[in-house]
Amino acid sequence: MSATESCAKNVQYRVDHLLSAVENELQAGSEKGDPTEKELKVSLEERDLWTRFKELTNEMIVTKNGRRMFPVLKVSMSGLDPNAMYTVLLDFVAADNHRWKYVNGEWVPGGKPEPQAPSCVYIHPDSPNFGAHWMKDPVSFSKVKLTNKMNGGGQIMLNSLHKYEPRIHIVRVGGTQRMITSHSFPETQFIAVTAYQNEEITALKIKHNPFAKAFLDAKERNDYKDILDEGIDSQHSNFSQLGTWLIPNGGSLCSPNPHTQFGAPLSLSSPHGCERYSSLRNHRSAPYPSPYTHRNNSPNNLADNSSACLSMLQSHDNWSTLQMPAHTGMLPMSHSTGTPPPSSQYPSLWSVSNSAITPVSQSGGITNGISSQYLLGSTPHYSSLSHAVPSPSTGSPLYEHGAQTEIAENQYDVTAHSRLSSTWTPVAPPSV
């Protein structure tokens, strides 16, 4: 075998599979063909779905940039000459002589129609093609776009609020004989709109259109967000009676309480703390992460325990009484000198009378004083006193019953404490 014959054989092998593919393509729709074209038939796909839209008066969106149709117009063809070439076209004609309007949940005629726009014809992108190709699979017009502006580019211009009916035309090409057939389907009539008017049409399109699932998911997310917002608003209303919250460095959560001045503090060191503290006051996120643990406890626990919380700054500065709580975690103090009991947490009590402050000390001094976070914001620090000034024997309600000698033994005696005035006068330590 010569080199020329070998090369020709290789070329034949290379094109055989190509010719076979073409023949298979032609044979795919040939069984539906009719060279005489006497039994040409075009049938609508998804007729039941179109009928459901027809019963509700179908609507199609038209936009400046063009919007695709749904349901998509699809037809099946039979009776074409498998070996002849055809071009398939689509146009839209007015279904009536009315301009429509949507009133009280239904479409009613609303006047005379506008002049018809110049006729626009959409040519199927597979055109021209053999009859076998058109008959092999349903012909879909999924790429046609409806617009209300004259843009060109193969888009179909329609007048809004007018009813239209699509028509499909089949034209035989490639020969001297031209044959044109037209087919229309009443189920495909629709009213062109810039926005859906009938909510049932919207729901039906969302249900059956796979490309509308994103719109459905977005709507569900918005509904869920609204539910969350309503829940947060309700939670805010439940906490409105608790007033302003104050968290000291010690980790106690306190709220104003009209019944008692000092109660047991609500500790946040335990994981069973306040639920969502950062979202109680507003919806804005904090610039720094909250150090408190978020739990799913019911917010009612805070409301129920509000009477036991520490009451701090109220709307007025007049403190009528000051009672020390019987709580071992309240206002921890450190002792520098003296020999008080190691469990004592209140080494110094201040008695205010006639604008004078009389320090009563068991240990001889205060190391750190009472933090200004628990008292008035302008309260000065009394870092240290060199001496304990003896209190007068009379005139001070703190020592009316001789409670001075009992403090060391009863560190939580709250019955003999004095009342504090809103006016505090700084006093210097007495000289020796």
UniProtKB/Swiss-Prot annotation:
DNA-binding segment(s): 49-217
Record's compositionally biased regions (Polar residues): 293-306
Record's keyword terms, sorted: Activator, Developmental protein, DNA-binding, Nucleus, Transcription, Transcription regulation
Presence of keyword Metal-binding: no
Localization terms from the record: Nucleus
One matching Pfam family: T-box
GO biological process entries: cell fate specification; cellular response to fibroblast growth factor stimulus; determination of left/right symmetry; embryonic axis specification; heart morphogenesis; mesoderm formation; positive regulation of DNA-templated transcription; positive regulation of transcription by RNA polymerase II
Predominant place of localization: nucleus
Quaternary data: When not bound to DNA, exists as a monomer. Binds DNA as a dimer.
Function summary: Involved in the transcriptional regulation of genes required for mesoderm formation and differentiation. Binds to the palindromic T site 5'-TTCACACCTAGGTGTGAA-3' DNA sequence. Causes dorsal mesodermal differentiation of animal cap ectoderm when co-expressed with wnt8 and noggin. None of these molecules causes dorsal mesoderm formation when expressed alone. Establishes the left/right axis at early gastrula stage by directly up-regulating mesodermal expression of zic3.
Name this polypeptide is given: T-box transcription factor T
Gene source species: Xenopus laevis (African clawed frog)
Organism placement in taxonomy: Eukaryota, Metazoa, Chordata, Craniata, Vertebrata
